[in-house]
Amino acid sequence: MSIRNYSRRDVLKFSAAGVAVGTLGACATSAGAKGKVVVVGGGWGGSTTAKYLRLWSDGGIDVTLIEPNTSFVSCPISNLVIGGSRRIEQLTTNYDGLRRHGVNVVHDTVTAIDPDKRLVRLASGQTLPFDRAVVSPGIEFMFEQVKGMSPA
């Protein structure tokens, strides 16, 4: 038996896959109606989850990804930009790949999630119903929370 070292990318894929698989069964509905999953956040976690929920359900789940930004910058390889090996444009992509997989991409900001009514409210005033919601907004540094720390 050999031991394999897993990369951070492998761990992320396995984590997203676990979330996706756990959500698939929960979205099953009667009479052939499609389940609805709303994914909040279009970073690595949210985008991967949205893609694989759609793929693994063979189109049986309506997946909507909500992300305010129209493009995604791959931060894990951003050191290549700092080092001059790449330009930021080479690490930036839009969400068309998810759309090709059947994911509905909405560029807006979530203002509230009502778990009782199963609704997501957007800054535009639109509400989206869901059977399951995946919240993956990414990180936000709160420098002011650490004494002596400030943004560069």
Predicted regions and their residues:
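Core beta-strand elements of the Rossmann-like FAD/NAD(P) dinucleotide-binding domain
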Residues: 126-132
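Redox-cofactor binding/interface segments in oxidoreductases and associated redox assembly factors
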Residues: 122, 135-136
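Glycine-rich dinucleotide-binding loop and its adjacent helix/turn
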Residues: 137-152
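Beta1-alpha1 glycine-rich phosphate/pyrophosphate-binding loop at the start
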Residues: 29-104, 148-149
